[in-house]
Curated annotation (Swiss-Prot):
This is UPF0134 protein MPN_151. InterPro entries: DUF16. It comes from Mycoplasma pneumoniae (strain ATCC 29342 / M129 / Subtype 1) (Mycoplasmoides pneumoniae). Signal peptide: none annotated. It holds the Pfam family DUF16. SUPFAM superfamilies: MPN010-like.
Length: 133
């Protein structure tokens, strides 16, 4: 059946017969829902586009941070190498100083042994000159 300008004209529907006016109201209601859905989808599409831009920006920032981190790691490693070198030089210097002190102590010990020997010799002479009573 077709619409012939009569608002009371009936059309066959699965749920029964409806008037053209009811059909148009239903159609208008559906059109409004579709418009609302389209508006919502458009807004969500815009939000998705904004989120994609944010993700791209964050990806760029991550790459920049990774490059900065790599540069800092290289600088840190260079500083650690320099620090290790300075520590090794300091330890070597301390070792040399301790070796020098050891040599000096050995020399002093030799001198003291020599002096002790001389004192023993002097005591022996004195004992010969003036024997103990």
């Amino acid at each position: 059946m077709e619409f012939n300008g009569n608002l009371n004209h009936m059309e066959k529907r699965k749920s029964g017969y409806v008037t053209q006016k009811q059909f148009n109201e239903y159609k208008d209601s559906n059109d409004q829902r579709l418009i609302k859905i389209e508006t919502t989808l458009a807004a969500q599409g815009e939000q998705i586009s904004q989120l994609v831009q944010i993700v791209f920006l964050q990806g760029k920032q991550i790459k920049e941070l990774q490059a900065e981190q790599k540069a800092q790691r290289v600088e840190f490693n260079a500083r650690m190498d320099r620090f290790e070198s300075l520590v090794l030089k300091s330890l070597e210097s301390i070792g040399n100083t301790l070796t020098d002190f050891g040599k000096r102590f050995d020399s002093m010990e030799t001198r003291l042994d020599s002096m002790d020997g001389r004192l023993d010799s002097m005591e022996t002479r004195l004992d010969k000159i003036d024997p103990p009573k």
